């Protein structure tokens, strides 16, 4: 394989038993392979947790060498309208499977991006071509998939991968690539990944371009992520009434890491639970963080929203000390 190959593709599982995490789901999928048949499937869960990996591995095991001819992957976020159903999906679904396959598989990724009309057309297509085609529908939020589609599928919910799963996958890759990962480097990868194996692998590949000894500093540097302790220090300054010092720390983080407003808010949210705050204080802060996050999505000033958030931390700290 080429040295510059993207690692998320290079290390994509070829078999269902190689998929990391989700053992209960992979066991069910393996049983489909053994029976030679499967229903329509709905995979729901956040990005990078193995939905596509399971779909591709399922097709590989089910079809063998003809899997490319009997399996197609479409991304619904590229074309949200009804045309993707009328053209791409129907054109593939109406042709007969090759070899000894009983049916073909259409893997529709990010299907929650489809409009309601497109989903209704998809439901009709699923019914019409059920004899020769199976659908694997992947989405981040199953609530955005219309009920008539959900009721026609076996639903599998993929949760974020835990630290053990991330460690297992990253350790395999590091060994194969001749990398040494320090403990703090692995902790940093787990922190950066947030349960997303794809993000962890991409972070490792980026770090490997500048060092073979992977430390926390290398991970945070290459992923433009602030160290958790630096975020905690900024919040502690605000809680202790040192608003201007916390503001200066914010400046330092913005310059050093080039963080976006949403990145900082996400890290603030994750770090504040490590500060030993009372539940009432946490409730008030979570409410304020949610408000700031919403305003950023609406186009508000990042700087003003984050500084307002630090000001709220200061006020909560002052109230706590009374």
Swiss-Prot record:
Keywords: ATP-binding, DNA replication, Nucleotide-binding. One of its GO terms (cellular component) is DNA replication factor C complex. Pfam families: AAA, AAA_lid_RFC1, Rep_fac_C. ATP binds at residues 45-52. It comes from the Archaea. GO terms for molecular function: ATP binding; ATP hydrolysis activity; DNA binding; DNA clamp loader activity. InterPro entries: AAA+_ATPase, ATPase_AAA_core, DNA_pol3_clamp-load_cplx_C, DNA_Rep/Repair_Clamp_Loader, P-loop_NTPase, Rep_factor-C_ssu_arc, Rep_factorC_C, RFC_lid. GO terms for biological process: DNA repair; DNA-templated DNA replication. Heteromultimer composed of small subunits (RfcS) and large subunits (RfcL). Part of the RFC clamp loader complex which loads the PCNA sliding clamp onto DNA. Belongs to the activator 1 small subunits family. RfcS subfamily. This is Replication factor C small subunit. It comes from Methanocella arvoryzae (strain DSM 22066 / NBRC 105507 / MRE50). The gene is rfcS.
